[in-house]
């Protein structure tokens, strides 16, 4: 017989209490966690001890208002409640204008806005809160997504649509400078710091970052890339996406719109696609498209970028080698459809979604429906909208009216059902960002985060690490001890997309001077004069050493035949004077490489040569004076001379050119991607 087990009342009570405790712990693990709810207009609904916003004010907890439900279900419910007009409005993103906001929100149904003014974090947050309140009053209470171009980098001058704000958040070197640090952990830290600053200020979407591979040295927008290496660009792209967004998009994320797909580096002779004369992308080297242009975008896609920005450039069949699989060709003789990226179904749907696995939405660049509608100039506005939607576009940049899209539906160029999947992607982003629950922020906290000394210290570290020592064969550096120093800064005029000397283009923003730690000789002298061991002299004859900082800008020839990167008065450099200074005294020549300039006339005469990439002067002087040993590496290959530039393949990075492309100095070092010295060698 099996033994009989008896249970006492005490043992039964103990077993029950344990079971209840286990059940309670399991329930706690599975119970929904209440997110922070801030409803300044919409009333709150209570379900037990949980709170929800009654965004449509009908007294019922609708599925789209229920944060416990999966995002896809919330999206589907909200879509079913939206009118055609509301869907079309959601597919527009325009520059923010407080005076027009009520009209934009309630008549045009726009919810995506680009911030282009250079305000403090406190001001941005306060204004965003006011705007979000107005959005919460709307029929369905759909919140606003505020977007911005990058605003955490040193810029001498601010440029519309590229770098419209600087100096109000932590101030880092330019993106080329971040690449030059050769420190992927520091780049990730930058992204995480910027994310916290942006989100606190009420900005939830970044028009960036720009991961185009810089293959054509004359291209104006190299300044805002991470350089010429597809591999290094891909590593950086991954960290930028993960740093800004996190492993998944959430209430603390800043959504990225990685640009400019499929890569704007291979422009014709450096001419920029913001202008009709620069519209062509050329791929003369067979296989270059997949080998060099796409890896950074693939890395961003794999990291989960929320959106991708297409560009204006129009792929040239006449000047391109074989790039695409034959089954993607338009015909036996036509490889590419020669239209701007926003209209190119092969690139956006077959390549980006089909082959690369992109799950987010496509955001056009500004003006693709109007001035930059390359290849579709003969189409009406509704036809352009229809072609772009069919190609795979969800969000039209700087379009302040959905009327053309509505007309496309009314003219039966599109069905409302064509808009639905694109609107679903946009709504998914807004839900994931947590904006339906809490679109508001604390303006004082925002300012505190933006002014963090710890963030400023990490940014200063990046400035110092970004500086590249190219030559020091005379051991002039570090420049320690007492010195009589002659100082000169030579700077080009602010360039625009049209460039200096060119017609058209979007130029410097009036009254905005960026973050000029040094905007000229006087500013640099003032900074140096704080060191009591340095005596600034006004004449080269009085000096025992000279410091010359060249800060050129690209010159766009009026004939629009090519962009000029040779150092000359046209790019802001008096070459004869530089050579005169170098001949008179040992000279530290510092060159700000926002493009890979042609330096063969000024480099040989210097005693030491350094490269900067939009850096604070304080960081440069720390390296010059020996307070920090240089560790930076070139993110670009510097061309040997004008002949090398003229011969370069615009779709191939400088380090991979098929001829002796790189500049070689007098000690036989080549200034190629990844090169950089330090004081110990």
Residue map of PLM features:
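Bacterial N-terminal signal peptides that target proteins for export
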Residues: 2-14
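Bacterial N-terminal signal peptides
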Residues: 11-23
């Amino acid at each position: 017989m099996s033994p009989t087990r008896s249970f006492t009342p005490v043992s039964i009570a103990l077993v029950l209490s344990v079971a209840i405790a286990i059940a309670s712990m399991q329930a706690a693990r599975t119970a929904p966690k209440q997110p922070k709810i801030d409803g300044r207009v919409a009333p709150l609904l209570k379900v037990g001890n949980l709170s929800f916003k009654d965004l449509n004010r009908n007294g019922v907890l609708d599925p789209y208002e229920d944060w416990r439900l999966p995002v896809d279900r919330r999206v589907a419910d909200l879509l079913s409640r939206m009118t055609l007009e509301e869907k079309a409005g959601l597919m527009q993103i325009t520059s923010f204008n407080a005076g027009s906001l009520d009209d934009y929100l309630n008549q045009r149904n726009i919810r995506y806005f680009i911030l282009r003014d250079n305000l403090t974090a406190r001001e941005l947050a306060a204004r965003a809160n006011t705007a979000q309140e107005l959005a919460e009053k709307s029929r369905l209470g759909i919140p606003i997504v505020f977007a911005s171009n990058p605003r955490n980098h040193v810029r001498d001058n601010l440029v519309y649509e590229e770098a419209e704000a600087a100096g109000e958040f932590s101030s880092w070197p330019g993106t080329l400078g971040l690449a030059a640090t050769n420190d992927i952990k520091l780049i990730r830290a930058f992204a995480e710091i910027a994310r916290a600053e942006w989100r606190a200020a009420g900005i939830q979407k970044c028009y960036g970052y720009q991961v185009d591979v810089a293959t054509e040295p004359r291209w104006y927008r190299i300044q805002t890339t991470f350089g010429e290496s597809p591999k290094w660009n891909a590593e950086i792209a991954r960290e930028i996406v993960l740093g800004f967004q996190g492993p998944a998009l959430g209430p603390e994320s800043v959504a990225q719109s990685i640009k400019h797909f499929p890569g704007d580096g291979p422009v014709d002779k450096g001419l920029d696609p913001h202008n009709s004369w620069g519209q062509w992308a050329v791929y003369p080297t067979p296989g270059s498209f997949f080998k060099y242009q796409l890896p950074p975008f693939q890395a961003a896609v794999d990291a989960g970028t929320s959106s991708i920005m297409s560009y204006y450039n129009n792929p040239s069949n006449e000047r391109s080698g074989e790039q695409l699989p034959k089954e993607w060709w338009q015909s036996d003789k036509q490889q590419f459809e020669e239209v701007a990226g926003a209209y190119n179904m092969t690139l956006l749907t077959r390549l980006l979604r089909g082959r690369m696995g992109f799950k987010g939405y496509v955001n056009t660049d500004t003006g693709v429906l109007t001035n930059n509608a390359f290849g579709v100039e003969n189409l009406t506005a509704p036809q352009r909208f229809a072609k772009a939607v069919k190609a795979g576009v969800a969000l039209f940049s700087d379009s302040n009216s959905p009327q053309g899209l509505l007309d496309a539906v009314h003219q039966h160029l599109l069905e409302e059902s064509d808009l639905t999947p694109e609107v679903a992607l946009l709504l998914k982003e807004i839900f994931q960002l947590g904006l339906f629950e809490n679109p508001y922020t604390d303006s004082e906290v925002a300012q505190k985060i933006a002014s963090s000394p710890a963030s400023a210290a990490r940014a200063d570290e990046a400035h110092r690490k970004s500086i590249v020592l190219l030559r020091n064969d005379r051991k002039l550096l570090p420049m320690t001890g007492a010195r009589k120093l002659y100082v000169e800064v030579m700077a080009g005029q602010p360039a625009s997309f049209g460039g200096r000397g060119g017609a058209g283009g979007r130029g410097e923003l009036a009254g905005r001077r960026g973050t000029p730690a040094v905007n000229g000789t006087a500013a640099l002298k003032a900074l140096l004069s704080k060191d009591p061991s340095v005596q600034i002299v006004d004449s080269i004859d009085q000096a025992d050493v000279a410091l010359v900082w060249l800060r050129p800008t690209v010159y766009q020839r009026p004939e629009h035949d090519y962009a000029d990167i040779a150092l000359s008065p046209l790019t802001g450099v008096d070459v004869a004077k530089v050579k005169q200074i170098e001949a008179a005294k040992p000279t530290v020549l510092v060159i700000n490489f926002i493009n890979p300039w042609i330096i063969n006339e000024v480099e040989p005469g210097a005693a030491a040569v350094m490269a900067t990439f939009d850096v604070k002067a304080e960081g440069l002087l720390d390296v010059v004076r020996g307070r920090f040993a240089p560790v930076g590496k070139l993110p670009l290959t510097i061309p040997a001379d004008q002949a090398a530039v003229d011969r370069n393949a615009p779709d191939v990075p400088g380090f991979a050119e098929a001829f002796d492309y790189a500049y070689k100095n007098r000690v036989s070092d080549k200034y190629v991607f990844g090169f950089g010295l330090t004081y110990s060698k």
